[in-house]
Amino acid sequence: MDATYRRLLGAALVAALLLAGCAGAPPPPPLSEPVAPLAPVTRSPREVALERALGEFSGAPYRSGGTTPDGVDCSGLIQALYQRTGVRLPRTVTDQYQAGAPVGVNDLRFGDVVFFNRYCQTRGRGPYLASILSLGDEDEVCHNGIYLGGGRFMHASPRGVFISRLDAEVWRVSYRGARRYFPGGN
């Protein structure tokens, strides 16, 4: 096989893979029964303040030790969000984990904080090694995010502040628990 043929074959393979990735799933079948509208969600004043603060931080860049929308890390995000609701939290993930009331995974509500050991292994080695190294110690917590509902949570990772799903394998296997900080629930 000459070099030109190999390059042409490689380019064709890449193009085929890209086109296959663009193909969408077929549309879902129509529903046989009408769907009832969702009941309106009533939020407490603290939850309204939390929703507003979430908007401020959405898409913020990652900055180790940061606590502002200009740059924030995971525990700084949680501390800053709760500060805007009038609730003072400690600064570190470990201290935040110890401060809240435990919540079962099936009882999660908007505003609860979820904890993981996903980034524990990166200490002293840089955050980008997290994707290739094994998880941290079973009992250690070193990453957290705020639960939004519907299995989603917002967190600050090395890629910035964004929303992930709890049922994604990386988060499911590194999940260590949740805490509630609003007095009397949310």
Predicted regions and their residues:
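Catalytic cysteine-centered active-site loop
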Residues: 58-110, 115-129
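Extracytoplasmic/periplasmic, Sec-exported soluble proteins
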Residues: 42-46, 66-74, 99-106, 136-140, ...
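C-terminal motif of bacterial Sec signal peptides marking the signal peptidase cleavage site
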Residues: 18-21
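Bacterial N-terminal signal peptides that target proteins for export
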Residues: 2-12
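Aromatic- and glycine-rich peptidoglycan recognition patches
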Residues: 2-3, 23-45, 120-186
